[in-house]
């Protein structure tokens, strides 16, 4: 049998979402929460055309790296810290796609976040040179806009170096950057795509094709047996810490079917009593993650898929303490199992 909600579903729904004039923000009552749990700050993701201001934030990506300020701590760039040339170019159509140099992404409270429309490593390096030149000019004129030491950092490294709010903002901006970067031309006719003026969508003026942001559904599974949880480690990824069974939902497949298939493929186990826990936006990989717990049906003997995993082992509940990073759904599910044991399956 499949239970869609836990017995605390009423509390879950009450605590998950609040909507106001088309915006939403995630509210979590109690607990440290995950990357998106930034209340009382409000996240507004509705698509709008907005004018940038000095206090707003601008992101410059190059592949999987983000340009940051790095002095005593890592921080992001304000609009006022970027070159005057950039600000001027926001007032006109500056590239062959009819796009302005700055693309509005979203806001958190009253701060707006923008993407600098740069798609290649060479373009990104030129922008950095511009900012260095601008910094020298400011210092010579004794203007108090020193942008500090610029550095490229991988987007995933921000999980351990910035606040939860900043990590969420950067991951969500990266999600949109990847989508804009990868959808400059129409996949149907090959013509240039133009950003729509009313919604977040790229439109082809030639054939009418409409391209929306990519969101890939995936599951995280806490497999439980005899008050133990199945912990894994990936075989071919940079991330080397403990994880849970995870995988993408395939065409024509429900999330619950994904749970059964992924567990069988990766560790050779059958599961039952599948219980939904929570979901999480995960901009690092353009995912919407859905968390489930499931009980082993039959034997607990593991058959490891070595192409996917380097390790899979049963870990007793008392040994799962202290694994919550207050960022990821996976880590919160580990902490939830430590706190509640097999009650997670109720």
Locations of regions flagged by a protein language model:
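Short, Lys/Arg-enriched N-terminal segments with co-localized hydrophobic residues
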Residues: 1, 13-33
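Nudix hydrolase/Nudix homology domain
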Residues: 27-183, 194, 238-242, 284, ...
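Cys/His-rich short segments
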Residues: 172-222
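N-terminal strand-loop-strand
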Residues: 201-244, 270-271, 294-296
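The catalytic Nudix box helix
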Residues: 243-278, 292
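Active-site-adjacent beta-strand/loop module that shapes the phosphate/pyrophosphate-binding cleft
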Residues: 280-302
């Amino acid at each position: 049998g499949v239970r869609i909600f836990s017995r605390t579903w009423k509390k879950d729904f009450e605590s998950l979402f609040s909507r106001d004039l088309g915006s939403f923000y995630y509210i979590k009552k109690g607990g440290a929460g995950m990357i998106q749990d930034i209340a009382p700050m409000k996240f507004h993701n509705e698509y709008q055309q907005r004018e940038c201001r000095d206090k707003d934030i601008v992101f410059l990506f190059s592949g999987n790296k983000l340009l940051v300020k790095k002095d005593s701590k890592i921080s992001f760039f304000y609009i006022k810290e970027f070159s005057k040339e950039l600000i001027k170019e926001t007032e006109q159509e500056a590239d062959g796609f009819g796009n302005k140099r700055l693309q509005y992404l979203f806001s958190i409270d009253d701060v707006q976040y923008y993407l600098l429309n740069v798609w290649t490593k060479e373009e990104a390096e030129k922008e950095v040179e511009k900012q260095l030149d601008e910094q020298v000019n400011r210092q010579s004129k004794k203007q108090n806009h020193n942008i500090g030491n610029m550095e490229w950092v991988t987007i995933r490294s921000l999980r351990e170096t910035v606040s939860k709010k900043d990590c969420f903002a950067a991951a969500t901006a990266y999600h949109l950057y990847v989508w804009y970067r990868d959808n400059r031309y129409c996949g149907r006719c090959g013509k240039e795509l133009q950003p729509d003026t009313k919604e977040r969508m790229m439109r082809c003026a030639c054939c009418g094709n409409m391209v929306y942001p990519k969101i890939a559904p995936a599951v995280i599974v806490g497999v439980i047996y005899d008050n133990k949880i199945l912990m894994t480690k990936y075989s071919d990824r940079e991330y080397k810490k403990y994880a849970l069974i995870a995988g993408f939902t395939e065409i024509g497949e429900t999330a619950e079917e994904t749970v059964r298939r992924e567990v069988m493929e990766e560790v050779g186990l059958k599961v039952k009593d599948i219980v939904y826990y929570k979901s999480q936006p995960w901009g690092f990989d353009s995912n919407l993650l859905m968390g489930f717990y499931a009980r082993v049906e039959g034997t607990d003997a593991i058959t490891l898929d070595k192409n996917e995993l380097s390790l899979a082992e049963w870990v007793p509940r008392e040994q799962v303490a202290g694994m919550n990073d207050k960022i990821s759904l996976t880590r919160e599910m580990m902490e939830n199992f430590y706190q509640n044991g097999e009650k997670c399956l109720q």
